[in-house]
């Protein structure tokens, strides 16, 4: 197990953040590796079932049952869209920020999630989850240059800076 003191992932309309913290140097480096690998080299390219489990898929438990849509994100977003507070917050963002990414719900509208196809999902990842479109923040009692050199050597140097053109609108 990990000795982390904080580990999470959060999505926003214009970013995804992966904050981690550990008082143990070896554990911190391990968590950094896990996250860097998961973000820049995810299994989604080799295992389409991840998209089906996490995104959406059709499900039929018994042959007499009605065919239904299921999936982790799909079900989470159904919950978000049924919460009055979240509905109000969403309409507020649409009204205040009509020409920005904040007009969108980062998880997607449940009614439209089943329209997303696997290849579109992969294209989205290739475009937005790229080092040229990221910030990496380090803080704490560490040799920052050593960490930056490590991140460059093990991860960042394998990507070209001109691979991705970003338009957040």
Short names for language-model regions:
Residues 1-169:
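Charge-rich, well-structured scaffold segments of protease-associated domains
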């Amino acid at each position: 197990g990990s000795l982390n003191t904080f580990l999470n992932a959060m999505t926003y309309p214009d970013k995804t953040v992966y904050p981690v913290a550990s008082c143990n140097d070896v554990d911190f480096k391990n968590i950094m590796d896990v996250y860097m690998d998961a973000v820049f080299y995810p299994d989604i390219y080799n295992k389409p079932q991840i998209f089906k489990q996490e995104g959406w898929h059709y499900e039929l438990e018994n042959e007499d049952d009605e065919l239904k849509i299921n999936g982790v994100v799909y079900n989470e977003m159904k919950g978000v869209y049924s919460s009055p507070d979240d509905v109000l917050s969403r309409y507020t963002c649409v009204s205040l920020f009509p020409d920005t990414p904040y007009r969108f719900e980062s998880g997607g509208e449940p009614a439209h999630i089943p329209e997303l196809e696997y290849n579109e999902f992969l294209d989205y990842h290739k475009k937005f989850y790229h080092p040229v479109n990221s910030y990496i923040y380090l803080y704490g009692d560490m040799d920052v240059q050593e960490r930056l050199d490590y991140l460059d050597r093990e991860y960042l140097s394998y990507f070209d800076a001109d691979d991705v053109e970003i338009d957040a609108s």
